[in-house]
């Protein structure tokens, strides 16, 4: 029995390479939005949730996100969406519905494959009402752009922190430099100061000696026979 080997030619290799490189088969980039995922009435959903909050639950927010254009807003929404999901697990049925309504407005961030959060990220405790207000602000910032002028957010997949302030020198104006930076005294400057003070010291000594001599002379005139001090 003869087994026929499949025909293979350079044209087959070229065809396979073209298929692998085809953008249609590779899919869209991560964090890509061809249309705006933000609804026109998202503020109403946030307002309803805020109005029904019986307790201002404590949450945390990142305070040192890098101020990267459009990325910072996306990062803030990504962190807020994690909190909304967590609050849904402990909320009552009515609150769960309101939380889910808000979650649908920011759930689009889950389509982005973000990298693990960096260790440099710092969080502070705040209340859920503050988080909702900030989230609404970030949606307002993204709405005019996302799905329109800006569609590909793949450069935002790595959450970045601001540089540590302890390693940076604060900016200082020339006026501030003139007001705060005084030159340190140097030995040469001290010597110059002593040379300037020396003539004044000699003048004062001479004046004191002359005054003393005049007083002694007057005493000699009043009491003859008392020797006067010799003048240098």
From Swiss-Prot:
The chain crosses the membrane at residues 190-210. Disulfide bonds join 31-112, 71-156, 120-161. This is Fms-related tyrosine kinase 3 ligand. It comes from Mus musculus (Mouse). Residues 211-232 are cytoplasmic. Stimulates the proliferation of early hematopoietic cells by activating FLT3. Synergizes well with a number of other colony stimulating factors and interleukins. Essential for the development of natural killer (NK) cells, B cells, and dendritic cells (DCs). It comes from the Eukaryota. GO terms for molecular function: cytokine activity; identical protein binding; receptor tyrosine kinase binding. Residues 1-26 form the signal peptide. Homodimer (soluble isoform). Glycans are attached at residues 127, 152. It is found in: Cell membrane.
């Amino acid at each position: 029995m003869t087994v026929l080997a499949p025909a293979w030619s350079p044209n087959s290799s070229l065809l396979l390479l073209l298929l692998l490189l085809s953008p249609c088969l590779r899919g869209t980039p991560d964090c890509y939005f061809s249309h705006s995922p933000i609804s026109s009435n998202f503020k109403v959903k946030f307002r309803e949730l805020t109005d029904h909050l019986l307790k201002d639950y404590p949450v945390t927010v990142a305070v040192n996100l890098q101020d990267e254009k459009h990325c910072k807003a996306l990062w803030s929404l990504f962190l807020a969406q994690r909190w909304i999901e967590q609050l849904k697990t402990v909320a009552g049925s009515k609150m769960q519905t309101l939380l889910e309504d808000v979650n649908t407005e920011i759930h689009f961030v889950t389509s982005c494959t973000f990298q693990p959060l960096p260790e440099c990220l710092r969080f502070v405790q705040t209340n859920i009402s503050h988080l909702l207000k900030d989230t609404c602000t970030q949606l307002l910032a993204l709405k005019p752009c996302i799905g329109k002028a800006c569609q590909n957010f793949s450069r935002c997949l790595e959450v970045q922190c601001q540089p540590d302030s302890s390693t940076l020198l604060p900016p200082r104006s020339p006026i501030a430099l003139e007001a705060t930076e005084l030159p340190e005294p140097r030995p040469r400057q001290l010597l110059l100061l002593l040379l300037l003070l020396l003539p004044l010291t000699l003048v004062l000594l001479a004046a004191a000696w002359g005054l003393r001599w005049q007083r002694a002379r007057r005493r000699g005139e009043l009491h003859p026979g008392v020797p006067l001090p010799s003048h240098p």
